[in-house]
Amino acid sequence: MSRMAEQQLYIHGGYTSATSGRTFETINPANGNVLATVQAAGREDVDRAVKSAQQGQKIWAAMTAMERSRILRRAVDILRERNNELAKLETLDTGKAYSETSTVDIVTGADVLEYYAGLIPSLEGSQIPLRETSFVYTRREPLGVVAGIGAWNYPIQIALWKSAPALAAGNAMIFKPSEVTPLTALKLAEIYSEAGLPDGVFNVLPGVGAETGQYLTDHPGIAKVSFTGGVASGKKVMANSAASSLKEVTMELGGKSPLIVFDDADLDLAADIAMMANFFSSGQVCTNGTRVFVPAKCKAAFEQKILARVERIRAGDVFDPQTNFGPLVSFPHRDNVLRYIAKGKEEGARVLCGGDVLKGDGFDNGAWVAPTVFTDCRDEMTIVREEIFGPVMSLLTYESEDEVIRRANDTDYGLAAGIVTADLNRAHRVIHQLEAGICWINTWGESPAEMPVGGYKHSGIGRENGVMTLQSYTQVKSIQVEMAKFQSIF
C-alpha cells in the first residue's frame, strides 16, 4: 500500500489541522513501512475539542431516546457494510492478521454499539413514596463531556467499547487513540458523522499519550476519563484526573492471568484453551492467561500437546486468509518482549520452543517474535511476575488445589482467570476463590457486549460493557416533591 495522506484531527464533524505543528509517524509492523504522518493534538486543540463537544452534547442530550438510538444503529449498519475495508486498515496499522481483524475487531465493536443503542430507552429514573403528600423521583442525566484514551492492541474495538455507552447515555466523547495505532479511530469518527451524530459529539485527537492524554485528564471541562493501558500509565491518569477536577474514571489495565488445568481435564481441550489464551493476536491481549498451571504428573503430556499445536501456527503474509499469527505492534514493543525472553533464559526457565525473532523471507523487516513457551518456571521469575504482552507462555506445575489457588492469587494483578476441569463442583468452588474480575470455565477470551469486564486489584477500576457501564456514564439527580403546605420552624 502506498503512503497515506497526512492525517489530521477530527473536531466538530470534520478534519482540521493541529495547532501544535507537531507530527508523528505510524508504521506497518509487518514490514517496517511508514503508513502515514499523523498530526499531534496540543493543548489548544484539546480546548477546541472540549468547546466543540460541549456544544454538540447539548444538542445530543436534547434528542429523544429513540432518536439517539436510531443514529447509533445507523452507525452500526455502516460499520458492518465497511467491515472489510476497516479490517484491512486495522491490519496495516496493527500488524494483526486480516483473518482476525475481519472477523473480530470491527464485528465485536459493532455488536457493542448495537447493544447500547438498544439500551438507550431503558435509562429510567425511579419514584420513591415518602408519605401521602410527598415523594421523590430520580433522573439519570448525562455527565457531559467525557474522554476516552485507547490502547494500541484493539484500536477500533476499544474506541467503540468506550464511545458506545458514553454516547448512549447522552454524553459527548473526545477520544485519543494510541499514537502507535491511530488510524481507524479517525474512520470511526467519519462513520458517526455520516450516521447523523451532531457535530462535536465524537471528536478524535491523535497525539502522544504523555502530552495529549495529560491535557485531557487535566482539563476542567471533562467529567470522566475512561482509560485502557498499562498499570503505571493508568495510575498517572487517575492521579491527574482527581487532582484537576475530581473526574470519574474507568481503568482497564494490565494482567498476568492464571489458567489452571486440573488433573481431570481433557488435556486436548486444555491445550487448545492455553494456545488461545497466549497466542491469539500474537499474545497482545490484556486478559491473556500467561501463567499456565498444570498438575506435575500431567506436565510432560501437556508440553507435547502444546508443541503439537505450536506447529499449527501460521505466520506470514498478514493478508493471507490462512495466516493466524502476525508481528508485534511495533519495533520498540518487539524489543521489550525480547528483553523479557532473555530474562527468562537468564533466570533458568527452559525454552520449550521459540525464544527469538522469526527469521527468513517476509520476516526480516518486521517486528516478528516467534511463539515462545517456557517450562520449568517458578513463581518468582520475572516472566511469571510481570506482564509481557507478547507471545510468551509460562508453564508452572502444582500438587494440590489449595496450593494452586494461593499461587494464582499471588499477584498485584486481577484482570482475568480461568480453569479447565470436568468437575462442575470444583469449577465453581475454585473460580469463586480466584481474585479476578473476568473468569472463564472451560473456555477463554470471549467478552460479549452483555458481559461486564474489568479487573480486581491493580488491573483496574470500573467495568466496560454490560448494563452497569451505561449507568456509569450518568449521574443521578434526586428531586423531592411536597404537595402539602410547607411548614417552617421560623
Swiss-Prot record:
Q: Which GO terms describe its biological process?
A: glycine betaine biosynthetic process from choline
Q: Which UniProt keywords apply?
A: Metal-binding, NAD, NADP, Oxidation, Oxidoreductase, Potassium
Molecular function (GO) terms for this protein are: betaine-aldehyde dehydrogenase (NAD+) activity; metal ion binding
* Top-level taxonomic group: Bacteria
Instruction: Spell out the catalytic residues.
Output: K162 (charge relay system), E252 (proton acceptor), C286 (nucleophile), E464 (charge relay system)
| Cofactor(s) needed for function | K(+)
Site (described: Seems to be a necessary countercharge to the potassium cations): E248
**Record-listed K(+) 2 binding positions:** L246, K457, G460
| Enzyme class, spelled out | oxidoreductase
Q: Which InterPro entries match?
A: Ald_DH/histidinol_DH, Ald_DH_C, Ald_DH_CS_CYS, Ald_DH_CS_GLU, Ald_DH_N, Aldehyde_DH_dom, BADH
Report the cofactor remark: Binds 2 potassium ions per subunit.
Q: Report residues binding K(+) 1.
A: T26, I27, D93, V180
Where is coiled-coil annotated? none
Enumerate the Pfam families for this protein: Aldedh
What is the catalytic activity of this protein? betaine aldehyde + NAD(+) + H2O = glycine betaine + NADH + 2 H(+)
Tell me the route in metabolism or biology where this protein functions.
Answer: Amine and polyamine biosynthesis; betaine biosynthesis via choline pathway; betaine from betaine aldehyde: step 1/1
What residues does NAD(+) bind to? Answer: G150, A151, W152, K176, P177, S178, E179, G230, V231, A232, S233, G254, C286, E387
Entry's EC annotation? 1.2.1.8
* Cysteine sulfenic acid (-SOH) sites (modified residues): C286
The record's function comment reads: Involved in the biosynthesis of the osmoprotectant glycine betaine. Catalyzes the irreversible oxidation of betaine aldehyde to the corresponding acid.
* Similarity annotation: Belongs to the aldehyde dehydrogenase family.
Task: Give the quaternary structure.
Answer: Dimer of dimers.
Name of the protein in question: Betaine aldehyde dehydrogenase
- Give the source species: Escherichia coli O17:K52:H18 (strain UMN026 / ExPEC)
Traced from the root, the source organism's taxonomic lineage reads: Bacteria, Pseudomonadati, Pseudomonadota, Gammaproteobacteria, Enterobacterales
UniProt lists the gene as betB
